[in-house]
Amino acid sequence: MKKTIAWKMAVAGVLIAVCVVCSPLSIPVGASRCFPVQHLVNILAAVLLGPFYGVGMAFVTSLIRVLMGTGTLLAFPGSMCGALLCGLVYKYSKNIPLTCIGELFGTSVLGGICAYPIAALLMGKEAVLWTYILPFFVSSAGGTVIAVSYTHLTLP
């Protein structure tokens, strides 16, 4: 099946809607909210759409969640770094388990590092750099487990 721009935009819109509708399923951990559905969608976007659609979807979803009051500013670095890394990993490897590891590393380590200046400068929260890595890992791990199960059952 040829994936046209219209098809990709439609799938992206549906996945963004799933993330926004499932926003109440977040779990507070530390200064952030763990949102496993975002990480499931990041992996699905990597496999179905590619890295740049994934980053765009993560941005739009985070923006909508912040505007609705169901997310924090920390949603941006975690979801976008995870989406970019897992998208790039899948683009070049076509390996779903490796893509899931990319999502875990991108969200927890890279997203956690990028969250520090946002928390310190924009939110006024003083913390050490590694404070955000563990909560982001917990959130990403939940979504990654769901994604591995889902992709194993539905994708070839």
Show where each model-derived region lies.
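Loop-helix junctions at membrane interfaces
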Residues: 1-153
